[in-house]
């Protein structure tokens, strides 16, 4: 997918802007569970902001390491519903220079962290529509532009991409087998696994449509939005109703 670049995107180019020189797909995800181009965009977005950083969903902790490295003098708050960090990532995050500023929280991401504001928000937790919507409602209004910099929110698995194209192109037998099995299933499975989460995409689209955000940049499945305003009071209801209407229209 082509990268979306907003008018106020960072003009100076760094190594993170040269991800197009590399083969970037699901084969190079590693501990961070992101493509190289996605991780490069995450790094760039963090650098375009200031203030505290909030991460929803850290899994092995690879993305938390990237956030800590990209924002060496900033506080990082990472929320997950379990502690599942890779040992190498955990060792990095508990170094003396990181221990006091990186908070590895095990708590409910659908509840706001009291009395905290953030310059950057990264959401990669519950990918269901309901989960992403709840995370956005809980934390969006705590996202604030700081020191003249942008307030940005990054969403992983948010837009269609080619991350799994290499794998699915030659899986003809798998697709035929899935097609046959679907004849006997009450709930159909896709012949080609989705390369993004429709629930994440829907919430991001609603943020833009309701005027709360504009699209900043994207790479692979990663979408970065620029915050424009706080959420309308009834954003959750309006978004849920809009999604239900879209489903009914597609039947």
Which residues make up each language-model segment?
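N-terminal auxiliary segments of SAM/dcSAM-dependent transferases
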Residues: 1-6
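S-adenosylmethionine/decaboxylated-SAM
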Residues: 8, 12-251
């Amino acid at each position: 997918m082509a990268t979306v670049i907003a008018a106020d995107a960072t003009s100076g180019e760094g190594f993170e802007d040269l991800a197009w020189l590399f083969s970037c797909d699901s084969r190079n995800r590693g501990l961070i569970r992101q493509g190289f181009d996605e991780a490069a965009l995450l790094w760039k977005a963090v650098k375009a902001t200031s203030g505290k950083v909030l991460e929803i969903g850290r899994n092995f902790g690879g993305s938390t390491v990237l956030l800590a490295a990209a924002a060496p003098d900033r506080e990082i708050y990472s929320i997950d519903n379990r502690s599942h960090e890779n040992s190498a990532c955990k060792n990095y995050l508990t170094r003396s220079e990181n221990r006091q500023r990186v908070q590895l929280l095990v708590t409910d991401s659908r509840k706001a962290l009291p009395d905290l504001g953030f310059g950057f928000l990264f959401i990669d937790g519950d990918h269901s529509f309901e989960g992403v919507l709840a995370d956005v409602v809980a934390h969006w209004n705590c996202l604030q532009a700081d020191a003249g910099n942008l307030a940005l929110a990054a969403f992983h698995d948010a837009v269609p991409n080619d991350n799994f194209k290499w794998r699915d192109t030659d899986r003809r037998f798998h697709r035929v087998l899935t097609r046959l099995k679907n004849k006997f299933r009450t709930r159909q499975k896709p012949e080609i696994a989705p390369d993004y989460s429709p629930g994440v995409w829907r919430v991001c689209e609603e943020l833009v449509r309701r005027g709360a955000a504009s699209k900043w940049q994207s790479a692979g499945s990663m979408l970065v939005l620029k915050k424009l305003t706080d959420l309308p009071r009834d954003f959750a209801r309006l978004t849920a109703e809009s999604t239900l209407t879209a489903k009914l229209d597609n039947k």
